Amino acid sequence: MNSRLCIMALLLCFSQALLGHFTVIEEIEKLKKYFNSSSSDVGDQKDIVSDILRNWQNDRDVKVIESQIVSFYLKLFEALKEHKTIQESINTIRADLIVNFFNNSREKMDDFIKLTTIPVNDLQVQRKAVNELVGVMHRLSSNIRRKKKGSRCCFGGGDRLNQNYPARSI
């Protein structure tokens, strides 16, 4: 009986996840219809975001470009806030971004937006940013080194004595 409940709960979770995904897709379709994005003049041009994303293959690199893409869409949604007829769609998509990109943390999203709206032409901001730069660079470089160390696997080489026969040891 206990396993049946677990299976039912698992199915419920999957159905909720799929339902949420379809809801976002429906809202995106509403935006496409609102902007008439299937028009021939839209298809004649190169993609704005998809082509760029295809160029970034490395996992570490993908996170960098994904953050820029999310920033782009958040700015786009902010610019569209006056369009009342599509606000529900925008809010649904924004909520999905919070769940998927910001690990369901509104605070992380607020920090992200705060960082993207800092006025870089302000002299005081420039002075503070330059003052913090050494610490920021140190933290970023140590994060990259940590990721490189963590990405080593027992199947990918590393410090094993016998790399040709992973199951054997000398």
From Swiss-Prot:
Tissue: Released primarily from activated T lymphocytes.
Annotated disulfide bonds: none
Keyword Glycoprotein: yes
Major localization listed first in the record, in broad terms: secreted
Residues modified by glycosylation: N36, N103
BP GO annotations: adaptive immune response; defense response to virus; humoral immune response
Gene3D superfamilies reported in the protein's UniProt record: 1.20.1250.10
Protein keywords: Antiviral defense, Cytokine, Glycoprotein, Growth regulation, Secreted, Signal
Signal peptide per UniProt: 1-20
Record localization: Secreted
Record has 4Fe-4S as a keyword: no
InterPro entries assigned to the protein according to its UniProt record, in alphabetical order: 4_helix_cytokine-like_core, Interferon_gamma
Database matches in SUPFAM superfamilies: 4-helical cytokines
Listed GO CC annotations: extracellular space
UniProt GO molecular function: cytokine activity; type II interferon receptor binding
Family: Belongs to the type II (or gamma) interferon family.
Assembly: Homodimer. Interacts with IFNGR1 (via extracellular domain); this interaction promotes IFNGR1 dimerization.
Role summary: Type II interferon produced by immune cells such as T-cells and NK cells that plays crucial roles in antimicrobial, antiviral, and antitumor responses by activating effector immune cells and enhancing antigen presentation. Primarily signals through the JAK-STAT pathway after interaction with its receptor IFNGR1 to affect gene regulation. Upon IFNG binding, IFNGR1 intracellular domain opens out to allow association of downstream signaling components JAK2, JAK1 and STAT1, leading to STAT1 activation, nuclear translocation and transcription of IFNG-regulated genes.
Protein name: Interferon gamma
Species assigned in the record: Sigmodon hispidus
Source taxonomy: Eukaryota, Metazoa, Chordata, Craniata, Vertebrata
Gene that encodes it: IFNG
